[in-house]
């Protein structure tokens, strides 16, 4: 895994994996994110809370980005989108959430993958990259 840092305009950090890369979501990802979530809605429903009626709108996405940014700034959580390196296709997302410092040094790990990309080992690779980030970059002890 290679962790590289870019200027803020290019969404840092970028975690490079063999077939994928992880990076924080940006405004320009909305359309691809909304399309992937829409075609994967039934597939994701058993594991996710009910979606509000406006879940896939641009304004809901912007609120989501604002929450991600605040969590990142406060060291409470770290959201990443997962992209396939060969074509930069968005395949899913991971979130390191509920970060607790002090003695615990722990977080929760959430993830989702779009239906078209399931059963390809992408999430296994992304989880490995996310855990490496949690332990090596965030200095957590438990995930």
Residue ranges with predicted function:
Residues 1-116:
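GNAT-family acyltransferases
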Residues 76-77, 122, 139:
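Residue-level recognition of short, well-ordered coil/turn positions
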Residues 136-143:
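Conserved GNAT acetyl-CoA-binding A-motif
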Residues 112, 119-133:
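Conserved acetyl-CoA-binding loop-helix of GNAT-fold acetyltransferases
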């Amino acid at each position: 895994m290679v962790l590289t840092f870019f200027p803020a305009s290019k969404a840092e950090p970028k975690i490079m994996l063999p077939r994928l890369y992880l990076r924080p979501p940006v405004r320009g990802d909305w359309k691809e994110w909304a399309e992937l979530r829409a075609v994967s809605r039934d597939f994701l429903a058993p594991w996710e809370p009910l979606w509000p009626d406006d879940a896939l709108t641009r304004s809901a996405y912007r609120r989501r980005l604002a929450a991600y940014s605040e969590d990142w700034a406060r060291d409470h959580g770290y959201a990443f989108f997962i992209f396939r390196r060969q074509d930069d296709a968005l395949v899913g997302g991971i979130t390191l959430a509920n970060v607790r410092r002090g003695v615990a040094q722990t977080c929760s790990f959430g993830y989702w993958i779009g239906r078209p990309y399931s059963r390809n080992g992408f999430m296994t690779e992304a989880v490995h990259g996310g855990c490496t980030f949690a332990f090596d970059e965030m200095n957590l002890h438990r995930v």
